[in-house]
Amino acid sequence: MTVTDPIADMLVRIKNASMRRHPTVDVPYSKMKEKILEILLREGYIARYEVIGEIPQKYIRVYLKYKGKTPVIQDVKRVSKPGRRYYVNKEEIPRVLGGLGIAILSTSKGIMTDKEARLLGVGGELICMVW
């Protein structure tokens, strides 16, 4: 099956698995997905992840995080899509739930959170928002 938006596919897999209280979820590997997962790990939205296998069957196992029985990731929203890219400059970077969530951007300085982008004074493609 061909996936037209691999990033959205990963985010939805993580969201669905956490809503069903699964301990892990597997997603096909890509460098961009790994960078996004690094941010989610650093910000405390997932417990950990590991890259498993060799190309072409390489995948990432994501270990989900819960507070009691409540998933840490409440929702995710894919903003920039393959058919409709969404770019923001440094002044337009949104604050997710008044700072309780994060926005992930792809900038000229790499993939980073909204806070890091504001600190560096760069804008870019708004990939997704997580809360």
From Swiss-Prot:
Q: Which GO terms describe its biological process?
A: translation
The entry's cellular-component GO terms read: ribonucleoprotein complex; ribosome
- Kindly state the subunit structure of this protein: Part of the 30S ribosomal subunit. Contacts proteins S5 and S12.
A GO term for molecular function: rRNA binding
Pfam families cross-referenced by the UniProt entry = Ribosomal_S8
Question: Which family does the record assign?
Answer: Belongs to the universal ribosomal protein uS8 family.
Note the PANTHER family from the entry. 40S RIBOSOMAL PROTEIN S15A
Q: Which UniProt keywords apply?
A: Ribonucleoprotein, Ribosomal protein, RNA-binding, rRNA-binding
Q: Which InterPro entries match?
A: Ribosomal_uS8 (IPR000630), Ribosomal_uS8_CS (IPR047863), Ribosomal_uS8_sf (IPR035987)
What is the role of this chain?
One of the primary rRNA binding proteins, it binds directly to 16S rRNA central domain where it helps coordinate assembly of the platform of the 30S subunit.
Record protein name field: Small ribosomal subunit protein uS8
